[in-house]
Amino acid sequence: MNGTEGPDFYIPMSNQTGVVRSPFEYPQYYLAEPWQFSMLAAYMFLLIVLGFPINFLTLYVTVQHKKLRTPLNYILLNLAVADLFMVLGGFTTTLYTSLHGYFVFGPTGCNVEGFFATLGGEIALWSLVVLAIERYVVVCKPMSNFRFGENHAIMGVAFTWIMALACAAPPLVGWSRYIPEGMQCSCGIDYYTLKPEVNNESFVIYMFVVHFTIPLIIIFFCYGQLVFTVKEAAAQQQESATTQKAEKEVTRMVIIMVIAFLICWVPYASVAFYIFTHQGSNFGPIFMTIPAFFAKSSSIYNPVIYIMMNKQFRNCMLTTICCGKNPLGDDEASATASKTETSQVAPA
C-alpha cells in the first residue's frame, strides 16, 4: 500500500520514513508546503465572502417579492438553502483547518464538515433532477392536464432532502465513514479503503449508483426528450410565441445549471471513483485536493446563473438593494419576458 491508514484517516503517503502523523493532531506540512495550505484558506475565504451574501440575498429577495414565490422558484430556493448549509456548516470549518494545516476539530468535526458538504452537493443534484422532471412535464406534456403547482414543488423539495439525507447520513451511523481527504483539511466519504468494519465498499457502490449515476440518467433523459419536443413545437407552432420564449428561457437556465454542476462535480466523482477502484495506488495529496476544493465552488454558480438569466429576479434584487426603487426602471416591463412562472402555463 502506498498510503498510511489510521483508525479514522487515510494519508496518501507511505510511513516508511516515519514522518506521517494523524491529521487530527499534527500539521500536515510534510504533504504540501505551508503556502499551499494558505492558498486553500484564501480560496475558502473567497467562497464564503461570495457564497453567503449571494445565496442569502436570493432567499431574502424572494421573501420580499410575492411575485417571485412560484412553484418552480421553490426548487431554486432549495438550492440556495443547500448552498448556505455548505457555506456555514462546511466552508467555515475548512477555512479554519486550512489555516492550521490539519483538521483541528478531530473526528467529530470531520463528520460535521463531511456531512454538510455531502448534504449540500446531494441536495443540489436532486434539485436538478426535480427541475429536469418539472421541465419535462411542463414542456413535453406527457400528462396533458397536469400543472406543476405549489404542492408538487413542496413534495419535490421534501424529496431532495430525503434523498440527500439517505446519502449523507449513513456514514454518521456506521455505514462507511467521513475522513480527511487530500491535504487533510477537508473531509469526505472514504473512497480510499474498503474498511470492512463499516461496510465501506457497499456504501461507495450504493452512492455511485443511486446518488450519482441514476440522477444523471434521469436528467439526461428528461432533457433529451425536451429538446425534441421544443424543436417539434417550434416547427408546428403549437404554442404562442410568448409562451415558447418563456419556456425556452427557463429551460436554458436550468440546462446551464446542470452543465455547471457537471463541471464542478464530475472531476471530483471521477477522481474518487479512480481511487476507489485502484486501492493502494500511488497518488499524491494534491490529486484529490484540487477536485474536492473545486467542487465547493458549486455554492456560488446557481444563484449567479439565476440572477444573470432571470430578468424579473434581477430587477427585484435591484429594487431590494436600492431600498425599493429599481435604478434601471424596467421592473414591470421585463416581468412577462422572463417569468419562472412558466410551470403554470396551461396545456395548449
Curated annotation (Swiss-Prot):
Biological process according to GO: absorption of visible light; G protein-coupled opsin signaling pathway; visual perception
Keywords (alphabetical) are: Acetylation, Cell projection, Chromophore, Disulfide bond, G-protein coupled receptor, Glycoprotein, Lipoprotein, Membrane, Metal-binding, Palmitate, Phosphoprotein, Photoreceptor protein, Receptor, Retinal protein, Sensory transduction, Transducer, Transmembrane, Transmembrane helix, Vision, Zinc
- Which residues are modified to N6-(retinylidene)lysine? K296
Q: Does the keyword Disulfide bond apply?
A: yes
| Membrane topology category | Multi-pass membrane protein
Which residue ranges does the entry give as Extracellular-facing topology?
Answer: 1-36, 97-110, 174-202, 275-286
Q: Name one Pfam family in it.
A: 7tm_1
Which parts of the sequence bind Zn(2+)?
E201, Q279
Annotated protein name in UniProt? Rhodopsin
Lineage of the organism: Eukaryota, Metazoa, Chordata, Craniata, Vertebrata
Give the gene name.
RHO
